[in-house]
Amino acid sequence: MWTQRNAVGNWLLVLTAVIGFLTFIWIPQTSAECQTRSIYCYECDSWTDARCKDPFNYTALPRDQPPLMTCNGCCVKMVRHQRSPYEVVRRMCTSQLQINLFMVDHVCMMESSGNGHMCFCEEDMCNSSKNLHTNGCQLHLIAIAVAVSWLMGQLLSR
């Protein structure tokens, strides 16, 4: 028998499904590739420039920091041989890499051995950070996914 409670539950279920679907369609499109505006990224390699090493001295005078380059993509920070005497840090712009950004999704990727990582970010000088974090779109997606899961659980428990 069709009741008002079933109608409201079904309406909420449909609304939740639509919001969830739109979120998974919209969010990847907004964050799938690096922004088109120019940003500044540090460009250095700790193998040849000690200023590039971690921890990065972002409070140093500009002349005592590695060079900044204009970037029409994302800033990148790569670390090899992490936490060892042979650690190498490289900071650059994605325009210097041949990589499919749709696969990267602006996160940190660990090297298969676990001894290194590559991180992407989209703000001026963001590749100076020791630990790069996920961008706002990813946090937004996680929050919506949690809300959708909670709503689905509430509806299915009736």
Swiss-Prot record:
Pfam families noted in UniProt: QVR (PF17064)
Signal peptide positions on this chain: 1-32
Protein encoded by which gene: qvr
Residues of the propeptide: 128-158
Transmembrane segments: 136-156
Species name: Drosophila yakuba (Fruit fly)
Domain notes: Consists of a single Ly-6 domain, adopting a three finger fold stabilized by 5 disulfide bonds. The first loop contains a region essential for protein folding or that is required for localization to the cell surface. The second loop mediates protein-protein interactions.
Membrane topology: Lipid-anchor; GPI-anchor
Expressing tissues: Expressed in mushroom body (at protein level); overlaps with expression of Sh/shaker and nicotinic acetylcholine receptor (nAChR) components also involved in sleep regulation. Expressed in the adult brain and head. Enriched in the mushroom body, anterior optic tubercle, superior protocerebrum, antennal nerve and visual projection neuron fibers projecting into the lobula plate of the optic lobe.
Posttranslational mods: N-glycosylated probably on Asn-57.
Protein name: UPAR/Ly6 domain-containing protein qvr
Glycan-modified residues: 57
Family affiliation: Belongs to the quiver family.
Lipidation (GPI-anchor amidated asparagine): 127
Protein localization: Cell membrane; Membrane raft
Annotated S-S bridges: 41-75, 44-52, 71-93, 108-119, 121-126
CDD domains with a match to the protein in the record: TFP_LU_ECD_Qvr
Key words of the record: Biological rhythms, Cell membrane, Disulfide bond, Glycoprotein, GPI-anchor, Lipoprotein, Membrane, Signal, Transmembrane, Transmembrane helix
Loop 2 as annotated region, ranges: 77-91
